[in-house]
Amino acid sequence: FISQGSAADSLTDIYELALQSDPTLRAARANFQVGRETKNISRAYLLPVISASADFTRTERNSESSQVYSFIQDDPFLSKSFSDTDTTSYGVSLTQAIFDMPAWYQFQSGKALSESASAQFASDQQSLILRVSSAYLNALRAFDNNETRKAEQRAIQRQLEQTQERFEVGLLPITDVHEAQAIYDDALVNSLEAQGALNIAFDALQVLTGQNHDSLSGLTDGFMAVNPEPLDSQDWVSFSLNNNYQLKVAELGKDSSYNQAKAATAQLYPKITASARYSDTDSDGTQTSYLPTESSSGVSSLSDGHSFGVSLSMPIWASGINSGRRQAKQRSIAASENFEVAKRNTAQTARSRHQLVITNTARVKARKQAITSAESARNATQAGYEVGTRNIVDVLAAQRSVFQAKRNYANARYDYIFAMMQLKEVAGQLSPDDIYQLNAWLDPSLTVAK
């Protein structure tokens, strides 16, 4: 039913809820955060590495020895000694790559992957706009279909009742009643199926928002289908080749693979690394001896030092480098070919969607005219039935044609709207503004409910 009220959810309501609750978008946002760190991770191999160390050691030592200290007596004296030493050391070291081409190309690859993550997330955001629009329009489509199916059922039921009355007074044969009954039964089945489809369409909104939605704002009768601007399909192809986000993902994947191949080749290049180190060591302790008298002395030492160096390393032979280089090269070739495929598909999709919008624009106008034609045909058939030139099957078929024309018109309008959004999506121009512009054509005073 359609009721007057303001409690209905609008398209912007659904979209804004989906921005916060859609699990697909949340997963895409997390993947974007993962991807954007790739640049930082790969850049780390070009930055200096600073490390610090600290060490504390306590050493205790006991010793005993027998010694003779008299030429007269041979009795030995027992000599004992004990030492206790604490040693503390600190160190700071720095290493910096001066020339490391594999790390440089890995950094370039990481930058491309981070940019690819941004492009993919932009594509995912456009995908949400399409999914929200599709789900909302499908709910409106299902509602219109359900309304016409119920109206069709009621109209056929009235015709069936009139046919039965005429049969009872001997004006019609029993075959007309059976034919009308068969058509009514089919209309009843269609009505039940339409109600089920309406419930399913409303439930699909819950996947996006996590909430139940029982009523929506309907599309106004004043909505007009117009041709895309610009009208030339080649302009839309150019937009798509320059702005399509999935094409950007493919291009950046190609760039990343190219730099990966360069990094694999550079494994045979020399690497130059600079290093610096500073260290400090402090030792304090005591040493006690018994000879056999006791004597004690302190032990202390302090030392520090620093070093600087530059090292060069170059692989002479390493197993697997050549295989890795060939593998990376083939991956780069594959990525380049995939990018070419994406370019061609994007251009073809832009042309086909542009043509679909133009076709749907004309289709909306034709479907609207078809309603008038179907109603005229129904009236003529009804008049022929009254004078006996047409039978009940003709009348019911004419009535069903009117309702079918109304369904076709509603479907044509929704198809046009979604086709226009798909065209903007492939051209990289779809944005939340399109949601808000479409929402302006939804009548908040009309509530579409399941």
Predicted feature locations:
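Small/polar, glycine/serine/threonine/aspartate-rich low-complexity segments that form flexible
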Residues: S53-Q96, G222-P230, K262, S275-I316, ...
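A glycine-biased, small/acidic residue-tolerant capping/turn segment at secondary-structure junctions
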Residues: E375-L396, M421-Y436
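Short flexible linkers and secondary-structure junctions
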Residues: A8-N138, N146, I272, A276, ...
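Acidic, low-complexity, intrinsically disordered peripheral segments
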Residues: N408-K450
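Periplasmic alpha-helical coiled-coil/stalk elements that build and connect Gram-negative outer-membrane
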Residues: D9, S127-L241, L356, N360, ...
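Sec/SRP-type N-terminal targeting helices
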Residues: R26-A30, R43-A44, F82-T85, I98-Q125, ...
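Bacterial Sec-pathway N-terminal export signals of envelope proteins
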Residues: G5-D55, R61, H213, L219-Q260, ...
